[in-house]
A protein has these predicted regions:
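Final/C-terminal transmembrane alpha-helix of multipass membrane proteins
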Residues: 334-352
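Divalent metal-coordination and catalytic microenvironments
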Residues: 17, 55, 99, 300, ...
Length: 364
């Protein structure tokens, strides 16, 4: 059943994206010939007015066909005034940008709703879990509140800063000699906790962890939900969108770095994550839907044809030049763009296969 909802979620995002193009085209006086979900052979269609609506067989996207969007297209004289390339540049940009804009606005709306209703998760000063076999397992229990480490309380720091300083204090205890994985620190950490209303103090010797590159005692903090007002929820949603946008930009501008290439994911990977997330509850499913919608909007704004961003880019070039770009240039730009899109597709597919099976296409 979870796979069904993943499919429904993807369909919803595609429909809303194309609906953005559709309604913007109608609002700017363009003629829309088709509004289809998916590609390939037609499964079902119906015509209402001048537009044919339908569903095709291959679930890899959707499209809105606007009269005159192809420069080589022969437009009947009666539809000439409503053709895409007969409209001013600003109207074309509005129509093309409307699809990604809907995805970004939808992402913001979902994030705002989730943060406003459920609040924001914050790290709690209480122990969430204790790692078996580590020093903390001998003295700490889930629910214990950490009061001080080595007598340090950091009362002026925020909750997250205080916990980070606690961790650095523990990490300052080093093994005698060379720091090797699993070695025991030469000095103990004094932990002051509050348990059932009573204060207790324990001393434990941290173990050096090679991966963390510092000494640890082996516990993690719990989480609590901080209530947010409408303004704070909107700010949190905006911050999340900015973080994803800047991260996406960083990945695409550093694709020659192997670690960044590994961040690219495709339909298979997103579907697999969606399947797992939906089983963990509505909130996580909504958050995933928001971030997939945001990614769909951002990726479509990349300035390469046939993506929406490519159409926006060449419309701006036309505006700056004062005349349309030649058909030959547009064709070459489209060929390059399709090659880049296919590269992203196969790179994402390779990474997805690698994550699921441990093997990929070894793109290096």
């Amino acid at each position: 059943m979870s796979w069904f909802w993943v499919f429904v979620g993807f369909c919803l995002l595609i429909i809303l994206h194309e609906a953005g193009h559709f309604f913007a085209a109608k609002a700017t006086g363009m003629r829309v010939e088709r509004f289809f979900l998916f590609f390939g052979p037609t499964i079902w269609s119906v015509k209402r007015g001048e537009t044919e609506y339908g569903v095709k067989a291959i679930p890899l996207g959707g499209y809105v066909k606007i009269t005159g969007m192809n420069p080589e297209e022969e437009v009947p004289p009666e539809h000439e005034a409503n053709a895409y390339f007969r409209k001013p540049v600003w109207k074309r940009i509005v129509v093309v940008a409307a699809g990604p804009a809907v995805n970004i606005v939808l992402a913001f709306a979902i994030l705002f709703g989730v943060y406003w209703v459920n609040g924001r998760p914050e790290v709690d000063q209480r122990v969430g879990s204790v790692q078996p076999g580590m020093p903390a397992a001998k003295v700490l229990q889930p629910g214990d509140r950490i009061v001080a480490i080595d007598g340090k309380r950091f009362p002026q720091a925020s909750a997250s800063e205080r916990l980070e300083r606690f961790a650095k204090t523990v990490g300052s205890h080093e093994c005698a000699g060379k720091q090797v994985d699993g070695c025991v620190a030469s000095t103990p950490v004094k932990i002051e906790i509050e348990r059932n209303g009573a204060t207790k103090t324990f001393s434990v010797y941290p173990h050096y962890d090679k991966e963390a590159e510092r000494a640890l005692i082996g516990f993690s903090y719990g989480q609590k939900m901080a209530t947010l007002g409408a303004g704070a929820a909107a700010s949190e949603a905006g911050d999340a969108i900015w973080e994803v946008a800047s991260g996406t930009f960083h990945v695409f501008t550093h694709l020659f770095e192997e670690e960044q290439r590994k961040q690219v994911s495709g339909v298979v990977g997103i579907s697999d994550v969606g399947h797992q997330v939906i089983e963990k509850g509505l909130e996580r499913a909504l958050l995933l839907l928001a971030f997939v919608s945001l990614s769909l909007g951002l990726v479509n704004l990349l300035p390469i044809l046939p993506l929406d961003g490519g159409h926006i880019f060449w419309a701006l070039v036309e505006k700056l030049r004062g005349r349309p770009v030649s058909l030959r240039v547009m064709e070459r730009a489209t060929m390059v763009g399709i090659a880049v899109v296919l590269m992203f597709f196969f790179l994402g597919l390779s990474n997805d296969i690698g994550r699921i099976t441990g093997e990929g296409f070894e793109v290096r």
